[in-house]
């Protein structure tokens, strides 16, 4: 588990928050891989976006991919011609957001895949052990709303008037960020 033991790392409420969304070849961290990433770097107290990142990642084990997952994310080898290696994406993120707190809709998925990828590439953790899960904030907000029958990104966006193009990480993460801003800031 990543931990900041260095006393020079920023205090919790001063750390940058990296809103992050991955698309995967499936949801099993032991068999599947990250193939697309979008991230928004924000800084407290108002969580202004100071930088962003987007990349397609070269899949190396398509034989173990879940075909349904590939359909959902729109995987097409022609669209991945400019994809970068996993290691490069990890280095890019670590340079973009050192000492950050990860945030996302259900950010535990990204957390699990990110830890596995960093370990596989023998790279250090660049993020804190704390997570900001926007789904949990939405749950607290909508828990008594009789119109919210299923709490997911699409329904939450509709309820809050946020636009989203599902399973496109750049759209998903911007929508997640907008939901966060509307519920917290």
Protein language model features and the residues they cover:
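Conserved non-catalytic scaffold segment of RNase H-like nuclease domains
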Residues: 2-112, 153, 158-159, 167
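Active-site flanking residues adjacent to catalytic metal/cofactor-binding acidic residues
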Residues: 20, 132, 171
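Conserved protein kinase catalytic core
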Residues: 27-29, 139, 178
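Short, surface-exposed acidic
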Residues: 77-79, 124-129, 163-170
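Substrate-recognition/cap helix-loop segment adjacent to the acidic, metal-dependent catalytic center
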Residues: 108-130
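Short alpha-helix plus adjacent loop in nuclease-associated cores
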Residues: 131-148
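A polyampholytic, Gly/Pro-enriched intrinsically disordered region
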Residues: 144-162
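Acidic, divalent-metal-coordinating active-site segment for phosphoryl/phosphodiester hydrolysis
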Residues: 168-181
